[in-house]
């Protein structure tokens, strides 16, 4: 039984079942399952094929049911082949320690050889396999595949470090690692596409919630590396994690989600592991709930009912003092976890919901406000309201708007 949700996906409980009509067709041959190696350290394997009927089932039935809103999506026109890509990467926070990561590549079956490419960055999930390269367990990825790959876009998505088939601990909201995972996934995917004799002249990037933050951080890295980005779009993006989390402590709202406690759990243990700050999570969490929080982060067996939804039970009382929070080791790391404080050059649209239970309208508009605050203002970033939408509803409503905007580029 799924007990709560992060980014609308399973948080505490078993992995979600595949959406109806969206199950992955197993790879047909042993050779396909074994995979193909390209560029020395990049491997890809066929994991399934979704036909037009399945893609349209996702758009017309599965997604409205899961996200809780009825949205008019553009019907799928073509089937899609799905591949898991395995690639070499490094952890920047640990002296570029080498690791292996995974992600998804979705290829439209149209007979064409050139396609626009969307890199989709997924939101927060509890299950290690509720990520792009296990698309039958990821309703948000399924929606992106159906709307974009089913309409002739190549689609890629990194699983992030510690997710998918990775043996690493989760690197939740660890900025440089998210940048590395997505950048290396793009490079690996381009190697796979070259092997398939396919090209992608236009690059789009998009993501929801945590994935919205990752999308903006990815954009920062791409612009720094001189990689052209045709356009970037997010939904419910916490572009300033310190402002987002401190808001739950200092200015709680009546509609704040009951799964917010998990954001503190995942980030504190991830920061402790990736930034190598022993005792960071223990300093933040109350002794009564430290052990169950650690088990939740490490995906060990535990009773989900033991994780409190009341932040006053989970967090030590001194963290509700804004000055203490900001000056703590955890707070200082959070203050550096932002993805909007540079002069953005690429066209960006940040979609936000007026009644989102996790991301306030102020956070949703923050990147635009910052860019326009500089002198005469940088107009590259636009914040777009999706109306009175929930966290899930904001993403579901934004996706077809992303599509129309990307198509115009």
Cite the ranges covered by each PLM segment.
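C-terminal catalytic histidine-bearing segment of alpha/beta-hydrolase fold enzymes
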Residues: 323-337, 349, 358, 365-409
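Accessory cap/linker subdomain of secreted extracellular hydrolases
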Residues: 56, 238-341
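Catalytic-loop region of hydrolases
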Residues: 22-113
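Short, surface-exposed "cap/lid" segments of acyl-processing enzymes
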Residues: 93-102, 106-151
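Primarily recognizes the serine-hydrolase "nucleophile elbow" in alpha/beta-hydrolase
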Residues: 187-258
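Active-site machinery of serine-nucleophile hydrolases
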Residues: 138-164, 179-186
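Short beta-strand/loop motif that positions the catalytic acidic residue
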Residues: 344, 349-356
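Alpha/beta-hydrolase active-site loop
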Residues: 172-194
């Amino acid at each position: 039984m799924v007990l709560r949700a992060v980014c609308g996906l399973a948080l505490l409980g078993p992995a979600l079942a595949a959406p109806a009509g969206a199950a992955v067709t197993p790879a047909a041959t042993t050779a396909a399952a074994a995979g193909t190696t390209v560029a020395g350290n990049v491997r890809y394997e066929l994991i399934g094929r979704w036909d037009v009927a399945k893609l349209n089932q996702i758009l017309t039935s599965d997604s409205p049911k899961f996200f809780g809103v009825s949205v008019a999506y553009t019907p799928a026109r073509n089937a899609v082949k799905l591949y898991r890509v395995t690639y070499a990467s490094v952890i920047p926070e640990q002296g570029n320690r080498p690791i292996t990561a995974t992600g998804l590549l979705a290829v439209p079956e149209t007979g064409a050889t050139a396609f626009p490419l969307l890199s989709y960055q997924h939101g927060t999930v509890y299950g290690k396999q509720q990520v792009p390269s296990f698309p039958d367990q990821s309703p948000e990825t399924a929606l992106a595949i159906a709307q974009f790959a089913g309409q002739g876009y190549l689609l890629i998505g990194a699983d992030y470090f510690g997710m998918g088939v990775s043996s690493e601990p989760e690197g939740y909201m660890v900025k440089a690692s998210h940048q590395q995972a997505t950048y290396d996934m793009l490079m690996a995917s381009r190697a796979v596409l070259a092997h398939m004799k396919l090209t992608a002249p236009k690059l789009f990037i998009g993501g929801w919630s945590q994935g919205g933050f990752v999308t903006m951080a990815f954009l920062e890295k791409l612009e720094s590396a001189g990689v052209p980005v045709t356009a970037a779009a997010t939904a419910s993006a916490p572009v300033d994690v310190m402002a987002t989390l401190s808001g739950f402590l200092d200015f709680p709202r009546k509609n704040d989600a009951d799964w917010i406690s998990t954001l503190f759990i995942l980030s504190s243990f991830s920061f402790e592991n990736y930034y190598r700050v022993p005792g960071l999570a223990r300093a933040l969490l109350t002794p009564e709930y430290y052990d169950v929080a650690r088990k939740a982060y490490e995906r060990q067996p535990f009773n989900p009912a033991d994780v409190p939804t009341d932040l006053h039970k989970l967090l030590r009382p001194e963290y509700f003092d804004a000055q203490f929070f900001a000056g703590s080791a955890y707070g200082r790391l959070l203050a550096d976890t932002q993805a909007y404080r540079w002069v953005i050059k690429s066209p960006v649209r940040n979609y936000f919901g007026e009644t989102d239970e996790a991301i306030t309208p102020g956070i949703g508009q923050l990147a635009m406000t910052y860019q326009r605050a500089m002198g005469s203002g940088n107009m590259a970033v636009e914040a777009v309201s999706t109306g009175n939408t929930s966290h899930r509803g904001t993403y579901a409503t934004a996706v077809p708007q992303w599509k129309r905007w990307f198509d115009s580029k």
